[in-house]
Amino acid sequence: MSEITVLIVDDSSVMRKIVERALRQAGLNLSRVIEAGSGREGLEALRHEKADLIVSDINMPNMDGLEFLRQIRSAGLAEGVPVVMITTESGEEHVREALAAGAQGYIRKPFTPDQVRDRVLPLLVSA
């Protein structure tokens, strides 16, 4: 797989590192990792840099992951870029809401590198 740039949006710096490690363990060749601590920071990052994959938490201060997703989709900041939501939210309504907002994948915390691989790799192949 070719090198990719990933934007990881989560209000926990520890979780951002865990997600990065899981992506690497899943076999992704990450050339660059852009980190954002809120949806607002993620939105700003995409105004200046292009990502090949976006991984975002849902529950964050300032701008949650769903609003972040809606805004990047409506502004055309991530056309054709797969977005995967990683969150502790377990209800099916959260999955439906994320998919309706424009996410292509949804992973519940806690997760394994295998779960990340199984949900992310097909999205990158089809992107």
Region locations from a protein language model:
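Helix N-cap/capping motif at the beta->alpha junctions
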Residues: 35-44, 65
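Short amphipathic alpha-helix used as the core "switch/output" element in two-component signaling
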Residues: 44, 66-79
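Active-site residues of response regulator receiver
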Residues: 57, 87
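Two-component/phosphorelay signaling modules centered on CheY-like receiver
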Residues: 13-34, 123
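Receiver (REC) domain active-site loop signature in two-component systems and cognate sites
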Residues: 60
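C-terminal output helix
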Residues: 111-120
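Active-site beta3 strand of CheY-like receiver
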Residues: 49-55
